[in-house]
Amino acid sequence: MAGEDHQWQGSILYNMLMSAKQTHATREAPEARLRGSCWGCSCGSEPPVGREGQPGGPAVALLYRCCFCGEDHPRQGSILYNMLTSAKQTQETPEAPEARLGGACWGCSCGSEPRVGREELPGGRATVLLYRCCFCGEEHPRQGSILYSLLTSAKQTHVALEAPEARPGGAWWDRSYCAQRLGAREELPGGRPVTLPYRCCFCGEDHPRQSGILCNMPMSAKQTHVAPEAQPGAPWWDPSCAAQRVALKSPQVVCEAASAGLLKTLRFVKYLPCFQVLPLDQQLVLVRSCWAPLLMLELAQDRLNFETVETLEPSLLQMILTTRRQETEGDEPPSPQPPVQPHLVLPSEAEHLPSVAEVQAIKGFLAKCWSLDISTKEYAYLKGTVLFNPDLPGLQCVKYIQGLQWGTQQILSEHIRMTHRGYQARFAELNSALFLLRFINANVLAELFFRPIIGTVSMDDMMLEMLCAKL
């Protein structure tokens, strides 16, 4: 039948019979003539006789019996063969890396060997080399290629947005160096610069970079107008300012001189005959109220001169450095005296120290007395005028005290008339000096001259003890 021409050749029945005959005949063919290399799904064996085409008929697909699976496949190299093998490789390739892991794996682009036929196309034209990843089972470009760099850069861009939640370390204005700059924000087309906001690594919002011009400018116009009112601090010469507190430059010498002056003042008062006739409670009223102006007259008479230095509250770093310097002082040789610097005191001590204005009031009174060149008798009459003050609360013998004050002023006036030609001017100058005593606070004198000696003891207790003691 195969070598003869039939009138039914080309009909449907003829084709069915020929196909059935070939099905039964070709099953033994692969075992009899395995002369070519087999590719698993489309062997290289020769086609059966009479299958290339039919005489006078159209060309048909050339199917071959596979020597492994026993099925018919198109001949290798045809379009249908390439389509089938490509589809089959797509489904079967996830298991391929397990069989040929030839290099170190990088997770998304492993170093395994490329599949056969994927290096380049016929003709030498290079293609993108995709590799089957041994972890995710997908194809990725080879590490180091342009496509690989683009993909990994894009992946890092998406991952970086969630990174701020994993690494909080401080406020965004302290961590501007961690912020990631947003792309295409450098400048507009044409070279015109624009504000450079950066993605904050903590709050996830856009902020200007720290140390930039925008960062140093006020955040709003409201802050610009409010700032002067928000800090209504006193001027630098205000005595209430903590930086203008002062302390004695030589406290030991000055405090000893002031203590000696207080002792002489109490001795002068205690041994006055007109003062001794008063009851002890009335003596305490006079002394407790007048010891400060009496002391100032005594210090002026003794010409006590003192210097002060400004004090500053030390910062935490200064306290640490001072403590460390004191600990290592014994191991170091003595160094030359440094220049005078502001005295550092603790905040609890600084609030009790006198201010510059209060010390200037004390020095102003002393300078006034020294400029008048007051004599010893004038100082004694001035002390009596200050001591016998009838306006003090708690006095019971007011008439007696008032008479003592009037008598002291009369004696002072007679002395001035006898010693000075312009006695009225001299008397006015002495009264102006006494007027300055009103601006001197007794607590300031106690803190400045006596607190380092008596500690927490009050001056009222000191007056009682000195009156009862034998001076």
From Swiss-Prot:
GO annotations of cellular component type: cytoplasm; membrane; nucleus; ribosome
Boundaries of every NR LBD domain copy: 210-470
Metal-binding among keywords: no
Keyword entries, A-Z: Cytoplasm, Nucleus, Receptor, Repeat, Repressor, Transcription, Transcription regulation
Short sequence motif named LXXLL motif 1, residue ranges: 13-17
Residue ranges annotated as motif AF-2 motif: 462-467
Pfam name, any one: Hormone_recep
Location (main, coarse): nucleus
Domain of life: Eukaryota
Keyword hit for Kinase: no
Assembly mode: Homodimer. Interacts with NR5A1, NR5A2, NR0B2 and with COPS2. Interacts with ESRRB; represses ESRRB activity at the GATA6 promoter.
Name of the protein this chain belongs to: Nuclear receptor subfamily 0 group B member 1
Organism: Sus scrofa (Pig)
Gene: NR0B1
